[in-house]
């Protein structure tokens, strides 16, 4: 378990400015898909990318990225507009051409203060721009970019996008395009495609999409912590081989790690054995539609898979059993979406809506953020920043799967909002489960 130990710092922000597309953009109202309009997609992406200083010491990263933002909005012109609510609760985008919000900032310290983005450090909150919680949806900027300079020349780029206009892959596509324009490219290498009607159902009356109610936050009775845990690639591969020998079918790294985490977290939290626990995880559905969604589509094209089990059965069962439950959840979602229309079964949470009983896994390993190169190499680190209230995340059930510092090293798990004693128990359970397989060597 890696101990978080980041340093507090202060960010000086200059007045925000609006950055309009560098060329006139179409004035129109474009529709969002039914998936974009889901309540679960009303959140905000806050992505932070950390970079070393540019090799060219005369380069001004603030100016470069501000100009790149103006250029990329020509191709992503809907993002220069505003969201609008329709009568039936769905959303649309009014392409106003107003532009994106751009913030320049600076820190009187070196980039080393960001060496550990796994920490719940309130200082990190200053590295992105936050709308007030009561901001009307019509007043949200669809793109906000904050560039923060450090005394060593390193920079942090914070990008904020509403989930309603893109999913994780779509957000990474936009950031990559922004980086390409910063490098001097004439246009993005991947043409952005809006076409949200591709995900609308043939029969709106038949539309029943997976949604889940808000999850009750944990009672703040004790200090909560956040930590990371790396599972090396050799361990993952060996466990995969062991499991595949048992079931005679392919198992992915995600399935093995997700099952491992689900069991270990459930045991560490000491959830009553009579209760149910649920594992939620998003799946990219772009290739499952008929025809598949085109490359460059940056709207929400994800579905949420749900794996549920009784606590006693999960803890008494094998790793393979948990993997098979996860496989079934994936298969069920694929079956529902492998048609030309968006249709799934209605869903309700049968887990008492307690945050401990629900774990949402978010896999960031292949979204594309780590490939963003603004002209001075790839990012040192990438992080999804959650809004903190009173020093704690507003959403406490997410666990992120990230590449380790060196991608070939394995998978990094980022756990948050768990008491330090529980984090310690989680580590012990994880190591014991891994040792059970590795000791067979």
From Swiss-Prot:
One of its GO terms (molecular function) is 3'-N-debenzoyl-2'-deoxytaxol N-benzoyltransferase activity. It comes from Taxus canadensis. Its EC number is 2.3.1.321. Optimum pH is 8.0. One of its GO terms (biological process) is paclitaxel biosynthetic process. This is 3'-N-debenzoyl-2'-deoxytaxol N-benzoyltransferase. It comes from the Eukaryota. It is an enzyme of class 2 (transferase). The keyword Magnesium does not apply.
